[in-house]
């Protein structure tokens, strides 16, 4: 039932003016990813966009400066995902380093509080003595929460990156690159990126006011926070535009050099990752899921505590706790995915084809895992998916994932305009969104969402594609080129890791684990023998000893085991010939 994907090759921008000394392969890869000048390849901090272009930031730093001087109790209110956890930890660490002692944090519980700065969360902050609230990775849609804080006499600074609605909360300051009047060129900052920029601006303001001289302290080196910026940016799957690549590269470089938080070191250890060989993908696929597991199944305060702690021994205990939660999350997800596939089969049988947009619900699904489920089903069937779980009060909480061609938040906004009583609330981005609705309205939502996707989305976009960077020559299938590609990143969302295609003789094939296909192949036109592995293969099709030749979509990789390094390929797709 899994959709067969079609191969398409990228086209390079022939007008790109890239450095003449770049290797031809890198010129091709960069040009096909929209890089047009050497400036976009800058990875040093001097290439970062200036904080001065973020609207609202001047007002925010002045409020914070006054709070610092007066000893105001500041509560940072975060979010329960990896971006929210890193944003929270960065803000607390940053303000402490800048000289603020009266600061704490609060992370809403996914199951008890829901998302964002709600009135109930404001009451919790008030109970902890809040005199100023700073939101990180949330707040842009928290109208009621901000209004409630105002009635309690608590000013609010909102820092967020989610798309704003037609109206903004009545906060004392709002920093969000996606505000309509914000001139900051990068609209892809993660929440942790926005928080980092606020710390940069605050340090400058404090220096100009003589804050550090008065206290006879040196201004802190905020680059020490870039490990958190890299982790949150990659884990939140925001596009790695030029500015985010700088932030991520700088953070990766610090982690590789061992200059990172004990909590990140502990996450690296528990996930068996060598810091010196760390890639951006490791942040997204190894560290991020473990950190996210706290917010999905338990309480993200555990994750924030891990990132804040200064003791490696304590960090190892917390990382082990997160690892156990992540294993539980995987088990829950596997069961939910099996149930989702049964629902898809029923939908397919009832209408002979799957709807263009899938909305699915099961009364036993876990609301902390529906986002991952939606992502998995989207990948399998290449169409927008929203998965729902019961919230326990007669309502459902849904998490959506989209494909190129359908802006998920805009689609929900259109549904809200057409059917104002259908949803309770919604929010998000182009590729991901969250929402809630009354349980008895699910079937109506399922129908309306499917109709809207059918109306909005070109059917051709429902055909899954593998987008390749073309073939490699035999000479390019080498350790040197694999290392060149590893060093040419960071690769990530909207700046994908190089993927190549070619025809190979299939010399050996066997299953390892339960669902991974280990192969040895040789290029049809001649070249080196290559070990390869395809993860999560369809075991109803593979291994197939009757297949002698295959077309592969693959990544060059360096396999490191017990101190030995060897070339291998990671297979994304395999087609028998």
Swiss-Prot record:
EC numbers, comma separated: 3.1.-.-
Keyword Signal: no
Domain of life: Bacteria
GO BP, sorted A to Z: DNA recombination; DNA repair
Alphabetical keyword list: Exonuclease, Hydrolase, Nuclease
An MF annotation (GO) of this entry: nucleic acid binding
InterPro entries: DDH_dom, DHH_sf, DHHA1_dom, RecJ, RecJ_OB, SSDNA_exonuclease_RecJ
PANTHER family: SINGLE-STRANDED-DNA-SPECIFIC EXONUCLEASE RECJ (PTHR30255:SF2)
Function: Single-stranded-DNA-specific exonuclease. Required for many types of recombinational events, although the stringency of the requirement for RecJ appears to vary with the type of recombinational event monitored and the other recombination gene products which are available.
Family label: Belongs to the RecJ family.
Name of the protein in its database record: Single-stranded-DNA-specific exonuclease RecJ
Annotated organism of origin: Salmonella typhimurium (strain LT2 / SGSC1412 / ATCC 700720)
Lineage, opening ranks: Bacteria, Pseudomonadati, Pseudomonadota, Gammaproteobacteria, Enterobacterales
Gene encoding the protein: recJ
């Amino acid at each position: 039932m899994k959709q067969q994907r079609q191969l398409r090759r990228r086209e390079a921008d022939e007008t790109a003016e890239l450095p003449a000394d770049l290797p031809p392969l890198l010129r091709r890869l960069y040009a096909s990813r929209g890089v047009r000048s050497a400036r976009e390849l800058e990875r040093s901090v001097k290439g970062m966009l200036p904080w001065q272009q973020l609207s609202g930031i001047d007002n925010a730093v002045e409020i914070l400066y006054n709070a610092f001087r007066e000893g105001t109790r500041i509560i940072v209110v975060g979010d329960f995902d990896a971006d929210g956890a890193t944003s929270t930890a960065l803000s607390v660490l940053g303000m402490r380093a800048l000289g603020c002692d009266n600061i704490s944090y609060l992370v809403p519980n996914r199951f008890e509080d829901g998302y964002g700065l709600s009135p109930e969360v404001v009451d919790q902050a008030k109970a902890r003595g809040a005199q100023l609230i700073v939101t990180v990775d949330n707040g842009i849609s928290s109208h009621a929460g901000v209004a409630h804080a105002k009635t309690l006499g608590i000013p609010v600074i909102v820092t967020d990156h989610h798309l704003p609605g037609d109206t903004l909360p009545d906060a004392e300051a709002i920093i969000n690159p996606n505000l309509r009047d914000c001139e900051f060129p990068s609209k892809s900052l993660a929440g942790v990126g926005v928080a980092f920029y606020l710390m940069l601006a605050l340090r400058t303001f404090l220096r100009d006011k003589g804050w550090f001289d008065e206290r006879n302290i040196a201004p802190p080196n905020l680059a020490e926070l870039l490990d958190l910026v890299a982790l949150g940016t990659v884990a939140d799957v925001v596009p790695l535009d030029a500015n985010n690549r700088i932030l991520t590269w700088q953070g990766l470089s610090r982690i590789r050099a061992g200059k990172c938080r004990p909590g990140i070191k502990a996450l690296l250890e528990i996930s068996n990752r060598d810091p010196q060989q760390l890639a951006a993908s490791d942040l997204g696929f190894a560290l991020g899921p473990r950190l996210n597991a706290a917010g999905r199944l338990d309480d993200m305060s555990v994750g924030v505590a891990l990132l804040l702690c200064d003791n490696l021994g304590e960090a190892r205990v917390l990382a082990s706790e997160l690892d156990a939660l992540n294993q539980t999350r995987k088990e829950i997800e596997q069961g939910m995915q099996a149930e989702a596939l049964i629902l898809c089969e029923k939908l397919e049988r009832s209408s002979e084809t799957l709807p263009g947009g899938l909305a699915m619900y099961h009364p036993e699904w876990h609301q902390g895992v529906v986002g991952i489920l939606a992502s998995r089903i989207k990948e399998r069937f290449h169409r927008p998916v929203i998965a729902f779980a019961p919230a326990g009060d007669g309502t459902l909480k849904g998490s959506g994932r989209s494909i190129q061609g359908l802006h998920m938040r805009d689609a929900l906004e259109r549904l809200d305009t057409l059917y104002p009583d259908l949803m309770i609330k919604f929010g998000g981005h182009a590729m991901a969104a969250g929402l809630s609705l009354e349980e008895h309205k699910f079937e109506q939502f399922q129908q309306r969402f499917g109709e809207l996707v059918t109306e909005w989305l070109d059917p051709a976009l429902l055909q899954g594609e593998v987008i390749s960077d073309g073939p490699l020559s035999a000479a390019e299938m080498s350790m040197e080129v694999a290392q060149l590609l590893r060093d040419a990143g960071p690769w990530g969302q909207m700046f994908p890791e190089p993927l190549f295609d070619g025809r190979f003789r299939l010399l050996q094939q066997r299953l390892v684990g339960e669902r991974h296909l280990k192969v040895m192949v040789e290029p049809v036109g001649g070249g080196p023998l290559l070990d390869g592995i395809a993860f999560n293969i369809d075991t109803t099709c593979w291994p197939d000893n009757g297949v002698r030749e295959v077309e592969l979509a693959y990544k060059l990789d360096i396999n490191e085991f017990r101190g030995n390094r060897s070339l291998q390929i990671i297979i994304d797709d395999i087609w028998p010939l």
